[in-house]
Amino acid sequence: MTRFVALGDSITLGVGDPVAAAGQGSRRGWRGWAALLAEGLPDPSLHILATNGACSADVERDQLSQALQLRPDVASVVVGVNDTLRANFSPDRIASAAGHTVGSLCSAGAVVLTMRLPDPGRMLGVPGVMARPLARRAHQINEVMDEVAERYGTLHFDAAADAEAYDSRMWAADRLHPSERGHRLIARRFHGMLAEAGYPVAEPPDPEPSNTPPGRLAVLAWLATKGTAWVVRRSTDLVPSLVGMAIREWREGTADPASCGAPGVRLDVPGLDVPDLDVPNLAEAAEAG
């Protein structure tokens, strides 16, 4: 039996990859890349400890001890984007939490999977003055995870340098989480790394979605219903957070436009967590598109 324990935030929880729950009238749930990867492991026993909104410190405090009790053969730690929006953002504290989490899992004998987050410059359009501080923080978190991965010898997927990660089909309608295709990409990349490292694996996940991606009408329907509430939430948390970061950088004299690309960069924050948007409704309406 292969015990696979998945720690992290909503990316690992599977948000963006809806599946039907068992039983008549049951509400749809999430699958995600960890479940897809588990299918390619020998006799898998999957435990997803990831939670919505988790930061690095949350993973260390709330998920690590339970993960160690499960004595994992394979463990994943994919986290970081929620950290970027915190007012008390500190690369040193993130490095401490992530280092302790990954180091503890490695010391327990687990093969640990980690990931560099994609470049936050693709989907979510905000002015460059707000885009740059978030891009800078994401870059700092990737540097932290690079150091942690090198120190402990993790299997480290560089999603930031993966061209396929920037295909619009890889993202759900909210543009904040991977779509089923995106989750399959992550699962395939980790599967390939495990195979290359000599870990016994079965067939890799199919790159093609098993569910019909939502069509244009389905996306418009989501925007007209669930999307309206989403816009309101984003207007009262994401935008003020980005404005606050921009103001702090300006006051501290650290705002350097040249360091994070040209003004007007488009942002995509795939790991940013939001309340349950009932995205599965998109799958149900896919045939309408």
Residue spans of the language-model regions?
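Short glycine-enriched, charge-decorated loop/helix-capping segments at active-site entrances
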Residues: V19-R27, F89-D92, G128-L134, A172-A173
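Serine-esterase "nucleophile elbow" of acetyl-processing enzymes
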Residues: M1-N52, L64-R71, A75, A286-A288
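A short helix->loop->beta-strand "cap" motif at the edges of active sites that frequently abuts
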Residues: S107-V112, T154
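Conserved catalytic region of serine esterases and O-acyltransferases that act on ester linkages
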Residues: R151, D174-G289
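Substrate-gating cap/lid alpha-helix
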Residues: R122-A159, E180
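Alpha-helical scaffolding segments of alpha/beta enzyme cores, especially the outer helices
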Residues: R93-S96, H100-S107, Q140-E147
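Oxyanion-hole/transition-state-stabilizing segment in secreted/luminal serine hydrolases
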Residues: L13-V19, S56-R93, D119-P120
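Residue-level recognition of beta-strand->loop/alpha-helix junctions
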Residues: I48-A50, R116, D158-A161
